């Protein structure tokens, strides 16, 4: 056991004992099955497991680093989700800047149980999203996987990632506040999860899309070292972070959209949050689309790019799963929408061009795809090329950099199962989420609930929970990713391993450099 691990374990035992002590004279679990208790927290029973929702892990003023909040001695209800971070286009879900809450599902709140812990970070880039989505409720995963599941909300968009350091020391941690929130949540887990039946020495982080990108970034942040012991990213990569110059341009664009003078940071800090959210409609000064905020290379909290020029040394020993979905962009580029209407060989190159993130001649790209796959339709090539040139390269870079650095405990998957619910959707971005969580029947799932879906879900749950429990996926046939073989688990109705299954696409897109969108 390393000195770091030993320190975490000792601290956890002391703090977990303190959590339990606050429950006296009440028992660890209330006698009523409707009101389980762990220390200060009164939760509920959900689908056969104990659920504790809306647990505060920190509190923060706008644009400054969050801190843990001492307990004042009063009992705390933990029976509903806390509010999510303010954001655009999230309907009627309660939003608040006071959003630093997490949720726990556990089969048994016994401090001696020592179950592996799986901590989930949500997608939505760094801009939107929450863990209140029914697809990411943790009861099924906790029950069937025999693990403790934790899901975390944190600050997003300008509230979590606007770069304000040029305005002075008060804002020294800006640009990475959302990441520091996640680190604070992981510190809470390390300190308290034993009271919920979890093992603080077996904490796995996993996340989809933006959640995976947040994990990749944490793997290069010194303050995150030792707080998790395995990781899995699902269609979410972060090769480079934003540089401070681009980050500053985005801050100035936000302030201009809000009609603030360039130096009026007090106005930005004190304006109503609803008005601040309106500013997110501003155009991004660096790339097309709405204004983007994400992690910043500040040389303090994030002293290097996550996976450039190589994989961060501090995380090479962390066992890791990396995965992507075969046709990610079917979720972004609606097959029933205008970008696909009238698609033909005559216009496909022009329509591909704005969707790819690697600067290659789209006419040449289409020629290569037609040469390798002469039976593919324009639609098939459109989705393959936009996925391969937009959503997939980051995963290839991260896996290759880990392999090149000698990180042998790396496993890669490709999710191929098309939706049986919507045939035009194919296998699209987010479609692997319900298979891992076991939430096949949840609103928003495209998986269906047939026998094939249930069988694949069981396999993916074994893979992920196995990594959390043992540091290896729970599928013995899954070979580690090494060069030049590039073993890849193919998740479909048939689960199998293939070596470098998209070799020619990988080589095609490697002919030009990849620059992380938003950097």
Segments (PLM) and residue ranges:
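N-terminal secretory signal peptides and thylakoid transit peptides that target proteins
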Residues: 2-20
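Mobile gating loops/cap/lid regions near enzyme active sites that modulate substrate access
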Residues: 392-519
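Short glycine-enriched nucleophile-adjacent loop
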Residues: 212-223
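Substrate-access "cap/lid" subdomains that shape
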Residues: 88-90, 191, 225, 230, ...
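Non-catalytic accessory segments of hydrolases
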Residues: 20, 28-176, 446-460, 468-477, ...
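Alpha/beta-hydrolase fold nucleophile elbow
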Residues: 198-206
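Gly/Ala-rich beta-loop-alpha elbow adjacent to hydrolase catalytic centers
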Residues: 207, 211
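Alpha/beta-hydrolase active-site loop
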Residues: 173-193
């Amino acid at each position: 056991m390393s000195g770091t691990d030993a320190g975490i374990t000792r601290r956890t035992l002391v703090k977990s004992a303190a959590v339990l002590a606050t429950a006296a004279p009440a028992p660890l679990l209330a006698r009523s099955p409707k009101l389980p208790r762990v220390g200060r927290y009164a939760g509920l029973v959900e689908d056969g497991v104990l659920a504790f929702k809306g647990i505060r892990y920190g509190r923060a003023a706008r644009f400054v680093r969050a801190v843990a909040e001492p307990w004042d001695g009063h009992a705390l209800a933990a029976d509903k989700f806390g509010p999510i971070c303010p954001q655009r286009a999230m309907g009627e879900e309660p939003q608040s800047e006071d959003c630093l809450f997490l949720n726990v599902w556990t089969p048994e709140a016994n401090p001696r149980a020592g179950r592996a812990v799986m901590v989930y970070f949500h997608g939505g880039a760094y801009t939107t999203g929450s863990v209140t989505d029914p697809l990411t409720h943790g009861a099924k995963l906790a029950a069937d996987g025999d693990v403790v599941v934790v899901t975390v909300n944190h600050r997003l968009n300008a509230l979590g990632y606007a770069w304000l350091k040029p305005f002075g020391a008060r804002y020294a941690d800006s640009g990475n506040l959302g990441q520091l929130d996640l680190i604070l949540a992981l510190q809470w887990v390390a300190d308290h999860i034993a009271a919920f039946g979890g093992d603080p020495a077996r904490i796995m982080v996993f996340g989809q899309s933006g959640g995976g990108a947040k994990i990749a970034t944490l793997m290069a942040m010194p303050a995150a070292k030792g707080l998790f012991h395995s990781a899995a990213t699902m269609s979410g990569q972060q090769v480079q972070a934003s540089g401070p110059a681009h980050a500053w341009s985005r801050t100035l664009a936000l302030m201009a959209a809000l009609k603030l003078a360039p130096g009026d940071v007090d106005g930005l800090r004190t304006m109503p949050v609803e008005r601040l959210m309106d500013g997110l409609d501003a155009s991004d000064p660096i790339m097309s689309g709405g204004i983007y905020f994400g992690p910043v290379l500040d040389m303090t909290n994030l002293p290097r790019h996550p996976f450039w020029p190589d994989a961060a040394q501090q995380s090479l020993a962390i066992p890791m799963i990396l995965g992507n979905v075969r046709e990610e962009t079917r979720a972004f580029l609606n097959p029933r929408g205008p970008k696909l209407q009238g698609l033909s060989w005559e216009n496909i190159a022009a329509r591909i061009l704005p969707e790819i993130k690697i600067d290659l001649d789209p006419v040449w790209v289409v020629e290569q795809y037609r040469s390798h796959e002469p039976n593919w339709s324009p639609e098939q090539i459109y989705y393959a090329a936009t996925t391969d040139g937009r959503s997939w390269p980051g995963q290839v870079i991260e896996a290759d950099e880990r392999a090149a650095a000698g990180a042998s405990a790396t496993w890669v998957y490709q999710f191929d199962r098309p939706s049986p619910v919507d045939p035009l959707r194919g296998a699209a971005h987010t479609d692997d989420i319900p298979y891992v969580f076991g939430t096949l029947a949840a609103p928003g799932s495209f998986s269906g609930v047939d026998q094939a879906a249930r069988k694949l879900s069981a396999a993916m749950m074994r893979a992920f929970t196995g990594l959390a429990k043992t540091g290896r996926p729970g599928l013995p046939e899954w070979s580690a990713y090494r060069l030049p073989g590039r073993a890849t688990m193919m998740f479909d109705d048939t689960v199998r391993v293939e070596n470098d299954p998209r070799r020619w696409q990988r080589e095609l897109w490697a002919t030009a450099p990849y620059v992380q969108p938003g950097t």
